[in-house]
């Protein structure tokens, strides 16, 4: 066979495939070799980098890998800020960092760039597990960090995830094992570390805490301590915040190794941005809402954030101002909202040109809203650090912004000292009298018309008073000098809610306290930093149905009035005076809250009272477990008694039975029975008469309606086809347009209308004459009573047909046409 035959061509193709495989393998080897060389060169540049060099002005001056550099260029990040110039070189060298810088100074990139570089130099893949963990105190800030990470890391092959509350725990757990970088909130992350099987953090390379002072605060202390226990000691830790803590106890909890303290603005004249104009207004507590309303009405073409101390206040002011329509779009944001709603509101405010956002401190830290013109603080912040974070939502990235703080006269002196200590200078301004407008009457009208709004106003009042009462800084917050009656009146409330005070705890601890008891069993994180406890018992559909709650704002208030809200809301414990408590529920609460042990100190069995007469002996562990379930304790309770009330309001049992002696005093049983039968027969006879009269009246009305209907039908038949009717301009009564013509005398009749009226009373066979008919005696009628048409006559060469009646249907018109066509 020739060399060019099939066999030769097959051998040639096989050789080409082998050469192609060899080229690919060689190409991979060369590519791997180049990557190793690039990594060695990059590491060499990092080792030679001087962190204190003043020549670092752009990201291109830093020793960064190509994927990170290209991602920064594509996101239009070119020039380094002060905190980035100081922190990134140290982080690239692997040192722990404790960073503090002004709000809006670019701290997010200061830790995201080192995270990407650390994993890139380690050649991290999805099989290596979690490499970097970024913790944020709020969901909004976590979402923002994740979006920035996606932008600058678009050219990397790392997998990144966002783990926050408000989403399905099961769906997150399925994907968690494949993540290289996680952005999370403390509570949800700890929940995954405790519950998600196969989630391994032993290879963690870097831990980042944004707004670290807030994360290490009292509310997150347990979550952070438990979370750090799961993490390896050999990791790099970065802490960033606008107000950083240097306490040794905080740093020891996080196991920092010789941290570098980076504070680029520590020696600056002010702790707030240079372009921020800061003012404060001294306004009494009852006039705060009036001042806020006047401010919004004069700044309709602005983007405004209004901070308040509690979510109840945010909801009340938003609902009331929305009904009054100030002329600017209104939004509200607080920690009790669902995650989907919070994201939607955040996006709407971000994209809006002019808008006003009422918010709590959930957006006070780190969240970047573009082009915010004003930051208004209606309530005095708890400390100067909170003030700095709040005003930092405007004047970001060297732009300009303005901030206004409302202070009660009792708060002015003390809080200005706190601001001066933090290098914050604010100027006092006065409100023009023509800009003030009292809205107390409008709020009172709204509260009167809407019970929902009234009860929401009561909740807002209680939450504000509670926040002031629990403040630690008594030099600033002087509770006794506040005009609470005037404040309640300014909210539109009919009176001042009664509040019972008890000795409070630390305000931050209560503010960030876990609400696991309120929402246990849910797989979503109810608020930032809280720890959820999952129910172990099986919940049937009947249990779920019994646990359903009305979502109306009145529901919790009503439950509290009934004493059924003991564990519903930790925020309001011991602050609303309970006017009425159900005995059974109180007994169940007392039984459920008794001592853990089932025996008394003397060894006797413990007896728990479940009411006035019912008792439960705790003589076993099974009986002791009953105390934890109100549902199981119900069968040991006394049976309820149904009562009826007489006309005087006195309660009586529904079936009030006599004893034997009282019954015998009334006489013989047979006579009593006969009297009862006779009395009932009399009642039946009286009722029978009324029923017969009613039936007779209904039959009479039915006959009258039938007769009226028949008369109407007869009148319609006599009238024939409908004639057009004229309506007088000043009357609704129809008038016959031909009535005037009928009243005129007919030619040749002498104006006598007596004959015409007599003709109207002719037998039914003969129809009444019309206005155009002549009074001829020779009129002929057909069998059906209709006048016959006379023969046609010739007048002046024209054919004329005389009609005895006006055509009133199609049959008459056809007969007239046939007569005209005859010769």
Swiss-Prot record:
It catalyses: ATP + H2O = ADP + phosphate + H(+). ATP binds at residues 101-108. Residues 13-34, 539-549, 680-694, 703-720, 793-808 have a biased composition (Basic and acidic residues). Keywords: ATP-binding, Helicase, Hydrolase, Nucleotide-binding, Nucleus, Ribosome biogenesis, RNA-binding, rRNA processing. It is an enzyme of class 3 (hydrolase). GO terms for molecular function: ATP binding; ATP hydrolysis activity; identical protein binding; RNA binding; RNA helicase activity. GO terms for biological process: rRNA processing. The Q motif is unique to and characteristic of the DEAD box family of RNA helicases and controls ATP binding and hydrolysis. Interacts with the U3 and U14 snoRNAs. Associates with pre-ribosomal complexes. This is ATP-dependent RNA helicase dbp-4.
């Amino acid at each position: 066979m020739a060399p060019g035959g099939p066999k030769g061509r097959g051998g040639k193709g096989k050789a080409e495939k082998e050469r192609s495989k060899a080229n690919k393998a060689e190409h991979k080897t060369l590519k791997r070799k180049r990557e190793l060389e690039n990594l060695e060169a990059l590491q060499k540049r990092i080792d030679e980098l001087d962190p204190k060099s003043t020549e670092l002005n752009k990201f291109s001056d830093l020793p960064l890998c190509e994927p990170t550099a290209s991602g920064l260029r594509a996101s239009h990040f070119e020039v380094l800020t002060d905190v980035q110039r100081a922190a990134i070189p140290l982080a690239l060298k692997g040192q722990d960092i404790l960073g503090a810088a002004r709000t809006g100074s670019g701290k997010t990139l200061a830790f995201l760039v080192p995270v990407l570089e650390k994993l890139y130099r380690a050649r991290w893949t999805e099989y290596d597990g979690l490499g970097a963990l970024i913790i944020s105190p709020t969901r909004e800030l976590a979402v923002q960090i994740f979006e920035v990470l996606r932008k600058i890391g678009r050219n990397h092959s790392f997998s990144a995830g966002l783990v926050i509350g408000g989403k399905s725990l099961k769906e997150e757990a399925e994907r968690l094992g494949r993540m290289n970088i996680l952005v999370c909130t403390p509570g949800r992350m700890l929940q995954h570390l405790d519950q998600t099987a196969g989630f391994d953090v032993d290879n963690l390379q870097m831990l980042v805490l944004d707004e670290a002072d807030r994360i290490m605060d009292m509310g997150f202390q347990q979550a952070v301590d438990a979370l750090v226990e799961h993490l390896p000691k050999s990791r790099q830790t970065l802490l960033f915040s606008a107000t950083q803590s240097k306490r040794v106890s905080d740093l020891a909890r996080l196991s920092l190794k010789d941290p570098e303290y980076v504070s680029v603005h520590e020696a600056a004249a002010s702790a707030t941005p240079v372009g921020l104009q800061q003012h404060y207004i001294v306004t009494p507590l009852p006039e705060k809402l009036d001042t806020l309303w006047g401010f919004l009405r004069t700044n309709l073409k602005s983007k405004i954030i209004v901070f308040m101390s509690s979510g109840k206040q945010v909801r009340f002011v938003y609902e009331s101002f929305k009904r009054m329509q100030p002329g600017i779009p209104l939004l509200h944001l607080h920690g009790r909202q669902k995650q989907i709603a919070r994201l939607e509101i955040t996006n709407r405010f971000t994209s809006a040109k002019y808008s006003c956002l009422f918010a709590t401190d959930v957006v006070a830290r780190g969240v970047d809203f573009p082009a915010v013109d004003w930051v208004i603080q209606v309530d005095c912040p708890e400390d100067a650090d909170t003030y700095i974070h709040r005003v930092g939502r405007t004047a970001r990235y060297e732009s300009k912004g303005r901030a206004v703080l409302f202070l009660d006269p009792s708060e002015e002196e003390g809080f200005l000292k706190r601001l001066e200590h933090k290098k914050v200078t604010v100027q006092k301004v006065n409100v023009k009298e023509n800009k003030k407008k009292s809205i107390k009457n409008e709020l009172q009208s709204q509260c009167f018309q809407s019970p929902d709004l009234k009860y929401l106003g009561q909740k807002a009042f209680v939450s504000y008073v509670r926040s002031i009462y629990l403040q630690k800084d008594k030099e600033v917050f002087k509770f006794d000098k506040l005009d609470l009656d005037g404040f309640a009146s300014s909210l539109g409330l009919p009176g001042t809610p009664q509040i019972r005070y008890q000795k409070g705890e630390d305000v931050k601890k209560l503010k960030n306290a876990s609400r696991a008891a309120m929402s246990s069993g849910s797989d979503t994180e109810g608020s930032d930093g809280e720890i959820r406890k999952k129910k172990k018992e099986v919940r049937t559909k009947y249990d779920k149905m019994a646990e359903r709650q009305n979502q109306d704002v009145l529901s919790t208030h009503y439950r509290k009035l009934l004493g059924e809200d003991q564990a519903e809301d930790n925020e309001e414990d011991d602050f609303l005076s309970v006017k009425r408590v159900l005995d059974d529920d109180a007994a169940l609460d007392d039984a459920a809250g008794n001592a853990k042990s089932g025996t008394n100190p003397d060894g006797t069995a413990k007896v728990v009272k479940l009411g006035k007469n019912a008792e439960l002996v705790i003589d076993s562990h099974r009986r002791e477990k009953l105390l934890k379930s109100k549902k199981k304790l119900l069968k040991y309770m006394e049976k309820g008694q149904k009562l009826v009330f007489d006309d005087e309001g006195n309660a009586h049992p529904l079936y009030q039975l006599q004893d034997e002696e009282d019954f015998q005093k009334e006489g013989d049983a047979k006579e009593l029975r006969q009297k009862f039968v006779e009395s009932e027969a009399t009642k039946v006879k009286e009722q029978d008469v009324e029923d017969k009269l009613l039936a007779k009246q209904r039959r009479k009305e039915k006959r009258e309606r039938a007769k009226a209907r028949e008369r109407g039908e007869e009148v319609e038949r006599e009238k024939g086809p409908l004639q057009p009717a004229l309506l007088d301009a000043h009357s609704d009564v129809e008038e016959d347009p031909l009535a005037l013509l009928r009243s005129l005398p007919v030619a040749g009749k002498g104006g006598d209308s007596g004959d015409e009226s007599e003709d109207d009373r002719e037998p039914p066979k003969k129809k009444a004459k019309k206005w155009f008919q002549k009074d001829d005696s020779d009129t002929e009628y057909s069998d059906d009573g209709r006048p016959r048409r006379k023969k046609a006559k010739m007048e002046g060469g024209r054919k004329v047909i005389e009609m005895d009646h006006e055509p009133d249907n199609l049959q008459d018109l056809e007969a007239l046409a046939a007569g005209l066509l005859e010769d």
